[in-house]
């Protein structure tokens, strides 16, 4: 049974740039124990190939793949089950989440369900172009 002082680091990635940011963060903070969750779509084989090549290049050996369903209702249910699973595994631990998209509803819901956790947003820089055009 985990103790209250035990840390649990949960990292999310959906692109090779996220993996690079996670790797830099992990090295900077000297984090060896973590849970890496990949958000992937089955439809784009080239993107999947790039993710797996980046995982191999950076030395990530342990990770969980969360396949994103195309159906929005199934996606919602899958995300709820993931939150429940994380809730059970994280009881009595200090949590740190590396989230990948501040505009993502799932990432925001994590903040509601894990109020005492630390959240750090990693930025792959893609929204900069959208924000520049919009604002």
Region roles according to the model:
Residues 1-8:
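Short, Lys/Arg-enriched, disordered terminal segments
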Residues 8-135:
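Active-site and donor-binding regions of nucleotide-sugar-utilizing enzymes
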């Amino acid at each position: 049974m985990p103790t209250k002082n035990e840390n649990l680091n949960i990292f999310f990635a959906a692109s090779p740039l996220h993996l690079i940011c996670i790797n830099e963060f992990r090295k900077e903070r000297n984090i060896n124990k973590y849970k890496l969750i990949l958000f992937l779509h089955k439809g784009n084989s080239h993107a999947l190939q790039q993710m797996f090549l980046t995982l191999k290049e950076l030395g990530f050996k342990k990770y969980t793949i969360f396949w994103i369903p195309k159906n929005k209702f199934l996606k919602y249910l899958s995300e709820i089950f993931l939150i429940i699973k994380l809730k059970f595994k994280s009881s009595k631990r200090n949590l740190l989440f590396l989230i990948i998209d501040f505009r993502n509803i799932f990432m925001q819901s994590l903040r509601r369900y894990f109020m005492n956790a630390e959240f750090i947003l990693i930025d792959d820089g893609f929204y900069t172009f959208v924000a520049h055009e919009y604002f």
